[in-house]
């Protein structure tokens, strides 16, 4: 993939959208074939509360790129890229290990709606509750799968995680 993490990373990063807001289909980008594929349809009667994707040119310890939930009022097509500002991180584990999610908003030039959101503490509690609820329950009906949320981190923790994931990818 030619898309980089972003020229201003970690302050502004590129996110490749895999799953649009409102979707109950889990899409995943297949790096070898360079296409977005259907991974599965969610077993629960839930939909993704916001757009979901990853930062290209990053690598987590589990071998996957760093996941991002993009807070937005509009669904974005799978396979599109958007420039975002990280505002925090959701710490969680699933059946495969640690699986943190960066929480981000579109950069102001893309969508000024969230220009006043600079850190996770600025995000309304109702939005954080919606995110928590989704990730706590979206795998419940899938055999052998589970999720445990351990808390939130602020913008500085998110940026540190992004820098670590970029360094890990570059040293690979």
Swiss-Prot record:
It catalyses: diphosphate + H2O = 2 phosphate + H(+). GO terms for biological process: phosphate-containing compound metabolic process. Disulfide bonds: none annotated. GO terms for molecular function: inorganic diphosphate phosphatase activity; magnesium ion binding. PROSITE patterns: PPASE. Substrate binds at residues 26, 40, 52, 138. It comes from the Archaea. Its cofactor is Mg(2+). Mg(2+) 2 binds at residue 67. Keywords: Cytoplasm, Hydrolase, Magnesium, Metal-binding. The keyword Metal-binding applies. Transmembrane segments: none annotated. Its EC number is 3.6.1.1. InterPro entries: Pyrophosphatase, Pyrophosphatase_sf. SUPFAM superfamilies: Inorganic pyrophosphatase. GO terms for cellular component: cytoplasm. It is found in: Cytoplasm. Catalyzes the hydrolysis of inorganic pyrophosphate (PPi) forming two phosphate ions. Homohexamer. Maximal activity at 95 Celsius degrees. Belongs to the PPase family. NCBIfam families: PRK01250.1 (NF002317). PANTHER family: INORGANIC PYROPHOSPHATASE. This is Inorganic pyrophosphatase. The lineage of its organism: Archaea, Thermoproteota, Thermoprotei, Sulfolobales, Sulfolobaceae. The gene is ppa.
């Amino acid at each position: 993939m030619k898309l980089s993490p972003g020229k201003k990373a970690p302050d502004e990063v590129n996110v490749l959208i895999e799953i649009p807001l409102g979707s109950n289909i889990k899409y995943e980008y297949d790096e070898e074939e360079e296409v977005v594929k259907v991974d599965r349809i969610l077993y629960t009667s839930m939909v993704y509360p916001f757009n979901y994707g990853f930062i290209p040119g990053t690598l987590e310890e589990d071998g996957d790129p760093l996941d991002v939930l993009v807070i937005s009022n509009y669904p974005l097509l799978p396979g599109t890229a958007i420039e975002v500002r990280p505002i925090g991180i959701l710490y969680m584990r699933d059946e495969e290990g640690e699986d943190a999610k960066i929480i981000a908003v579109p950069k102001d030039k893309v969508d000024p709606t969230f220009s006043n959101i600079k850190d996770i503490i600025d995000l309304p509690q109702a939005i954080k509750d919606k995110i928590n609820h989704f990730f706590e329950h979206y795998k419940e009906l899938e055999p052998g799968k589970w999720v445990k949320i351990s808390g939130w981190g602020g913008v500085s923790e998110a940026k540190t995680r992004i820098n670590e994931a970029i360094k890990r990818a570059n040293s690979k």
